[in-house]
C-alpha cells in the first residue's frame, strides 16, 4: 500500500476482565489497580478497575501492523502520553494519521490517538514506523 500524507485509519476494541487477565498472565502486570476494587476505591482517584496501559497501546500496535501502514510494519519510536485511565468495559478506538512519508525509505510518521466510547482522548502522540514488506 502506498502511503499518503493525511491517510487515516481506526480500529476499536471493547476491553474485558478476560483481556486484563490474559495480559497479566503474559506480562506479570498484576498491579492491584487492575484487579482489586477495594484498592482502587482507597485511592480516591479512580472510578473503577483500569486496564493495563499495554492493552491500550496494544491496539495501536495491531492497527500499525494490520491496517496502516500494514503487514510487515514495526514501530521505530513512540512519543505518546496517557491522558485518562481506561476502564474495564470501555470501548476504545485507536486512530492513526500519516503525517509524513520518507521519500526513499519505508519510513513514515504517524499521529496517533486512542479515545473511549464517549469521545474522550485517553492517549495521544506521534510515532515513527518502518515497513519491512
Can you say where each PLM-predicted feature lies in the sequence?
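A generic structural signal for short beta-strands and their flanking turns/coil linkers
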Residues: 7-11, 29-31, 74-78, 92-94, ...
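Hot-dog-fold acyl-thioester-processing enzymes
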Residues: 1-73
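HotDog/MaoC-like acyl-thioester-processing domains
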Residues: 1-5, 86-133
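Mid-chain, well-packed structural core segment of small domains
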Residues: 66-90, 94
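Short, surface-exposed, charged/polar-biased interaction segments
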Residues: 30, 41-44, 61, 67, ...
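Generic structural detector for well-ordered beta-strands
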Residues: 10-14, 81, 128-130
Amino acid at each position: 500500500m502506498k502511503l499518503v500524507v493525511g491517510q487515516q485509519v481506526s480500529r476499536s476494541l471493547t476491553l474485558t476482565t478476560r483481556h486484563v487477565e490474559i495480559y497479566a498472565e503474559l506480562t506479570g502486570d498484576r498491579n492491584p489497580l487492575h484487579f482489586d476494587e477495594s484498592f482502587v476505591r482507597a485511592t480516591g482517584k479512580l472510578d473503577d478497575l483500569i486496564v493495563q496501559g499495554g492493552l491500550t497501546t496494544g491496539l495501536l500496535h495491531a492497527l500499525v501492523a494490520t491496517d496502516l501502514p500494514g503487514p510487515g510494519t514495526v514501530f521505530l519510536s513512540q512519543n505518546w502520553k496517557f491522558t485518562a485511565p481506561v476502564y474495564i468495559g470501555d470501548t476504545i478506538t485507536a486512530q492513526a494519521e500519516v503525517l509524513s512519508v520518507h521519500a526513499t525509505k519505508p519510513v513514515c510518521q504517524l499521529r496517533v490517538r486512542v479515545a473511549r466510547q464517549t469521545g474522550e482522548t485517553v492517549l495521544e502522540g506521534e510515532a515513527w514506523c518502518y515497513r519491512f514488506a
